[in-house]
Amino acid sequence: DSLALLHAMKILNRFYPKKLELYAITCNVGFEGMDFTGVRKFCESINVPYEQVDTEIAKIVFEDNKDERPCSLCAKLRKGAMYKRLGELGINKIAYAHNKDDFIETALMSLIYEGRFYAFPPVTYLPEAGVTVIRPMMYAPEKGVANFVINQGIKVVKNTCPVDGSTKREYAKQLMEQINSCLLYTSDAADE
């Protein structure tokens, strides 16, 4: 999703009256086998500066802490590393590639696990980091983003996180698929 957003913002820069200064950063959390060479090459191909911030987040989350909810801690540490680097570079905005499905899954997880309805807003200012977070793809469906990635020939980086595919987010994604299929089935039956 992130490379799709970067590519879309690069295209937008051709037409948008105010030029965007694009800079790509990847937070390498330290999972074995993660290879960001394709990201670097992609950024070079579209002429966007790129850097990789190396961290020991995987060690902290999976060895030192052994948290039962590693995703939450990992996300917080990744964001912290990113915001720190943004501050060092004097960058005050970050664009996350959260899509509509991410928004729905986040709201569903909040409802199930926290007993409240919460999801991220499209724009957030974080005073402690001095950063504004924007989510330009928040209304784009995941399938649309995936099609854009395929059509543009963007190479996807394989996630080597040991809990990938067995997370609360994955559960929320599967639950939404079940709900959608039930609603679709009900809608089809009502039409008959």
Label the predicted regions:
Residues L22, F103-S181:
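Catalytic subdomain that performs nucleotidyl-dependent activation
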Residues Y185-E192:
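Conserved small/polar residues in nucleotide/adenosyl-binding loops
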Residues T55, T160-P162, E192:
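Proline- and acidic/polar-enriched loop/turn elements at helix boundaries
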Residues D1-A107, Y113-R116, K143-N151:
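ATP-dependent adenylation/nucleotidyltransferase module used to activate substrates
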Residues G33, N180-L184:
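Residues at alpha-helix boundaries and short interhelical turns
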Residues T26, Q52-D54, R135, K158, ...:
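Structural signal for conserved beta-strand scaffold positions within catalytic alpha/beta enzyme cores
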